[in-house]
């Protein structure tokens, strides 16, 4: 006899997708603003602001491919602020989650316009964000930032994110 909540694949995938989006927002909020535009040691690579702008750009492309209009806002790597980035990431997470949710509710294998099946696309976007969150954490450390243990456990999902995320 099964115990606990029954398995609901589509709902749990959407929940994990939204949680991944909130983790990206959380990272943006905990990074010191002084690191936001600092060049990587050695001068090669993206700044943290540029990484976040890139993440949003990819999300925006796929949201628009899937029919979101006007789609999530673009971010300019030269002028984006952490507050603006957090808001834009929230919008893109919500718009993409809505596209995936509609596909799941209608038993469609794809979000029309996206290049991959819905589950594959959702997982790709989670992986893409996770990869770039890792880059941001590594860059922050390389620039001298030490993450608090609580922050790291929240980023890794072992501790709940703050309720406003």
Question: Where is each model-derived feature located?
Answer:
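Short, contiguous alpha-helical
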Residues: 2, 8, 14-28, 35-75, ...
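Short, surface-exposed alpha-helical recognition segments that flank or form part
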Residues: 8, 12-16, 80, 84-87
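Short, solvent-exposed, charged loop/turn and helix-capping segments
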Residues: 31-34, 104
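Helix-adjacent hinge/juxtasegments
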Residues: 61-102
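Acidic catalytic patch
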Residues: 100-115
């Amino acid at each position: 006899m099964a115990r606990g909540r029954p398995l609901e694949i589509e709902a749990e995938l959407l929940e994990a997708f939204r949680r991944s989006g909130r983790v990206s927002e959380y990272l943006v909020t905990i990074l010191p603003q002084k690191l936001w535009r600092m060049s990587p040691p050695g001068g090669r690579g993206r700044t943290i602001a540029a990484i976040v702008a890139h993440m949003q750009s990819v999300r925006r492309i796929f949201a628009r491919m899937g029919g979101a209009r006007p789609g999530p806002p673009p971010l300019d790597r030269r002028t984006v602020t952490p507050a603006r980035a957090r808001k834009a990431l929230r919008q893109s997470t919500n718009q993409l989650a809505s596209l995936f949710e509609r596909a799941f509710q209608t038993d469609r294998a794809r979000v029309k316009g996206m290049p991959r099946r819905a589950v594959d696309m959702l997982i790709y976007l989670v992986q893409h964000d996770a990869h770039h969150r890792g880059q941001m954490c590594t860059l922050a450390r390389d620039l001298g930032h030490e993450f608090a243990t609580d922050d790291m456990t929240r980023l890794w999902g072992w501790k709940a994110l703050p309720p406003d995320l």
